[in-house]
Amino acid sequence: MTVINSNISAIRASNASNSANKMLGLAQERLATGKRINSAKDDAAGLAIATKMTADVRAMGQGIRNSNDGISLAQTGEGALQEVTNMMQRVRELAVQSKSGTYSTDDRSSMNAEVGELQKQIDDVLTNTKFNGVTLFSKTAGTDVSVVIATGGSATDAVTLTSKGIDGTKLTSTALDVTDAAKAATTITNIDDTLKQVTATRASLGAGQNRLESVVNNLTNNATNLSDARSRIEDTDYSSETTAMAKAQILSQASTAMIAQANQSQQNVLSLLR
């Protein structure tokens, strides 16, 4: 039966054309943005998962940066204490030298002058060594300096760097004096005591640095794996989408041609009236 009020073929072809154009637009959007999920309507569940993964990856990235800052802080402190150790060793050496009875008062005075300069520098390093404004050392025995390094988004994701307190009373100009044998002996005792504290602080900072380096390695691996998983969820598969776009283009062209054919068949009805 031939009718003219409803062109079912043209309607069906038009619907097919609309579907093909939507498919084409979606494929082109995904290819242009590189994202399979560009809005919640594309994949609501996938978007939620990918968003959470993105938050985790960014937190890990900041944790890596924080950890590297912590490593730099530990290196700054350890480097300063290395110089303090060298100076303290030199003071001890001069004290041992001063204990010998072969040196005159003038000789010991010259030795003490060097000790005095070293004492000032030791005090300066322990007082003024800072990292981004954070004081790294305490000159009070038993009073430690602790710096918490956030390594992730959770409250428990943290590493504490601890700088042990160093007894500053044993590093004063009075405590380090080699003007006579008795004072030199006291100086040796004071140096030995504080060297133990300095060594303990260096060990603490070194252990913290090693832990932070492990944290960086672990976070880097986790962030890489999580980024890869997120990519599989939200990123465009170019081979698949290119195929989908080609298919949509063919369907769009074919449906447009069929619309023309369906409209032409309606025109043929006129020939029956001639």
Task: Kindly give the residue locations of the regions a language model identified.
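Primary detection of the long, small/polar-rich alpha-helical "axial" segments characteristic
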Residues: M1-R274
